Amino acid sequence: DERGIDNALLYDKEIFSVLSSKPIRNSLRGDDKTRDILYVKGLYKNSTLHIFVNHWPSNYGGKEASIPKRKLTALLIMKHISLIQEKDKNAEIILLGDFNENPNDENVRLLYDLGFVNLMEPMLGKPETGTYLYRGKDYFYDQIIINSGLKDKYELNVIDQSMYILDLPKYRQQKGKYKRYPYRFWAGNKLLGGYSDHLAIKISIHKIKE
């Protein structure tokens, strides 16, 4: 983006090998710049896995003004997903990252038209639960979204109910004005020495034995 921030995928080369990767240029209208989408195709347990790493346009400048930007991003991803599925209808695909929308917001919901399932959605409405806190309100901006190929009991599958927010006391501020907020590393120019202003999430994937 304009700050030089890019998406990345960290992986253990002992269990995952990259076959190909590329940034998908996310060109918004006008002079707006935002982060590229990182696409990685790799082998996990000798099965092909397609991963899209996302950081959708933020709500900076107002939510209503930013909604069209995220719609363009969603449509761009859907285009690339369709190209993958044209070649392999059983492709196993994961979308993950910071979508700057909740699972039930309009642009994330566009992905469901392709048969994708948001593993974060069942957590909506739980008290004091979320991955991001803004003005005292919890949001579920960080999500993992999978297609039916990862729920079909064939090859790679997400283990049921393995979706988990890494929400331990050390990851949140425990006192002061920002009590309960994720314990971030930086606050403006001030070094807090924490972890992130978002909480991490995780799932477990196993391979169905043939």
Predicted regions, residues:
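His/acidic metal-ligating clusters that form di-metal
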Residues: 73-96
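Metal-dependent phosphoester-hydrolase catalytic domains
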Residues: 83-91, 101-210
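Active-site environment of divalent metal-dependent phosphoester hydrolases
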Residues: 2-6, 59-61, 100-106, 138
